[in-house]
Amino acid sequence: MGLPWYRVHTVVLNDPGRLLSVHIMHTALVAGWAGSMALYELAVFDPSDPVLDPMWRQGMFVIPFMTRLGITNSWGGWSITGGTITNPGIWSYEGVAGAHIVFSGLCFLAAIWHWVYWDLEIFSDERTGKPSLDLPKIFGIHLFLAGVACFGFGAFHVTGLYGPGIWVSDPYGLTGKVQAVNPSWGVEGFDPFVPGGIASHHIAAGTLGILAGLFHLSVRPPQRLYKGLRMGNIETVLSSSIAAVFFAAFVVAGTMWYGSATTPIELFGPTRYQWDQGYFQQEIYRRVSAGLAENQSLSEAWSKIPEKLAFYDYIGNNPAKGGLFRAGSMDNGDGIAVGWLGHPIFRDKEGRELFVRRMPTFFETFPVVLVDGDGIVRADVPFRRAESKYSVEQVGVTVEFYGGELNGVSYSDPVTVKKYARRAQLGEIFELDRATLKSDGVFRSSPRGWFTFGHASFALLFFFGHIWHGARTLFRDVFAGIDPDLDAQVEFGAFQKLGDPTTRRQIG
């Protein structure tokens, strides 16, 4: 036929059998990719340290999605929460991956069958004998089935009635585990960080989908609406489907980037706003203050801070720090975290406690400035030593560590003090292994950043696709110069379907 690459889809325009075939093949490709990617990630994933080397630091992309739906065990004998297990059952990570690959193979065979046997009776109009689809009826069927699946997920899987539940954690991502979730029917269900809203919204949306599906199965669209929205044209279906997909992509890009109950920080890493707002820093200070109020020493109070909480309070885990074209996992950037060195507290020679001003998200370099409790600058690492008044040497700054590996260790040597002041700009200080993966020391983004960028980009692309195909179907008669109500389309000597010699070229 000699079709240009951008017109190849016209081959399924009036061919319901092969239209179905290519969609089944698309499902085969998607499921096959998901299963294969899962097996690849499992082959390279190291589950040995869920605290300092979690899945999101290792650049895992599909493992977090499996985990949030209730998969936690591997046939390799490990659990995502740490420790070993003896009976992971069929629905392990490998089991889910295998199920996707088997499903992909079955879809592949089904696609071939439907490509060969495309001319089925079910696709032909009994009155005219031509291929035709009752699109409003198909819409009703699909809406009904989607509603059943949505309701079933919310009522059974999420609630644990028949299923594992979902991943639920505390606000600081410390105690996450898979558990059953009760639906939240009150106003709290609309809080994006309340897991109960996931159950209740799926139940409500599923019920609505079932009722809407039954409505569209039992009520025919009015003739004017049918013609006005071109409901008999498959390109109308394409346009509205693209609209649904791009809308969903925009929504999930938002819930991923800003955070929600569906994107736990234990699985996808913290959000940039948690760094910007000092979210974890405030909680750490609150816990230390509570410890001091219970007559604990500073060392004891800091030693009780979970390493996991301290690790979140490190700029290297901020997804906005990764550059656009920096491929690879976070571990390939600043290295694999080995241990928390402890919290450094700086003091000048007068005994005032000094705080290092933290680096904002979008800075690559930032001046080292130490302020006192009132925000007054007391020390810095000057750019021009000749004019300095607040240098570490002049002010006599010392540093002492509390908690972590250097608990109780203090330094007064200015070179060492400046080294730790620079590192304190980046949050809590960790020992990082850059040798194992030959990490280059340049920050990378987490899967949270990749997912957001990918979905926002494709959503924008699909938005234009919706406008394009919507305009084509609504204004087809204008573009073609032909009355859409003609018995057979006459597109100035061209076939209705390019390369199809059976299409009539004129009426009669």
Curated annotation (Swiss-Prot):
One of its GO terms (biological process) is photosynthetic electron transport in photosystem II. GO terms for molecular function: chlorophyll binding; electron transporter, transferring electrons within the cyclic electron transport pathway of photosynthesis activity. Pfam families: PSII. The keyword Lyase does not apply. Binds multiple chlorophylls. PSII binds additional chlorophylls, carotenoids and specific lipids. It is a multi-pass membrane protein. Keywords: Chlorophyll, Chloroplast, Chromophore, Membrane, Photosynthesis, Photosystem II, Plastid, Thylakoid, Transmembrane, Transmembrane helix. It comes from the Eukaryota. The chain crosses the membrane at residues 21-36, 101-115, 140-156, 203-218, 237-252, 457-472. One of its GO terms (cellular component) is chloroplast thylakoid membrane. Signal peptide: none annotated. It is found in: Plastid, Chloroplast thylakoid membrane. SUPFAM superfamilies: Photosystem II antenna protein-like (SSF161077). Belongs to the PsbB/PsbC family. PsbB subfamily. One of the components of the core complex of photosystem II (PSII). It binds chlorophyll and helps catalyze the primary light-induced photochemical processes of PSII. PSII is a light-driven water:plastoquinone oxidoreductase, using light energy to abstract electrons from H(2)O, generating O(2) and a proton gradient subsequently used for ATP formation. PSII is composed of 1 copy each of membrane proteins PsbA, PsbB, PsbC, PsbD, PsbE, PsbF, PsbH, PsbI, PsbJ, PsbK, PsbL, PsbM, PsbT, PsbX, PsbY, PsbZ, Psb30/Ycf12, at least 3 peripheral proteins of the oxygen-evolving complex and a large number of cofactors. It forms dimeric complexes. NCBIfam families: PS_II_CP47 (TIGR03039). This is Photosystem II CP47 reaction center protein. The gene is psbB.
